[in-house]
């Protein structure tokens, strides 16, 4: 005889395709100082690992992606900046315990206009540390392949502009 479960169905037991979809929009990017270094942050991933990444965060109501990039860079690194270029948008999916998330992250190049490197101003306390990294060393330091690609795309864009 076949046994059936009398308990409620939990989201964990559902196929991921059946989970509700949530869309998230974020912005951030590469913030450069006058020595061509980029400020990056360390934060804990969903699995608890410390990972080095670009500063970024959710777009708030009434904000443009550029305004979000400036705000998030300042909150997570202490560095004030201005957007100088658009780089690319990362589009990806991930599955949580109760939903599938479709996330778009807009990345910009920013130039430092002030501030000091610190994580003390991060209202969400997500950033554990912040450091300056030479732009050419980002590929060795950034944890996420998509963010390494952002740096590569910006380097390629700058090289093209220099050769025009």
Language model regions located:
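Unchanged
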Residues: 59-82, 90-146
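A short, polar/proline- and glycine-enriched secondary-structure boundary/capping micro-motif
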Residues: 50-54, 128-131, 152
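Short connector loops at helix/strand junctions that flank enzyme active sites
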Residues: 24, 54, 85, 102-105
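Conserved beta-strand and immediately adjacent loop positions that scaffold enzyme active sites
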Residues: 28, 37, 129
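Acidic, metal-coordinating catalytic segment for phosphate/diphosphate chemistry
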Residues: 1-28
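Charged phosphate-binding loop/patch that engages nucleotide di/tri-phosphates or the phosphate backbone
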Residues: 140-164
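Conserved Nudix-box catalytic region and its N-terminal flanking loop in Nudix hydrolases
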Residues: 33-75, 79
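Local beta-strand/beta-hairpin segments that build beta-sheet-rich folds
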Residues: 6, 87-88
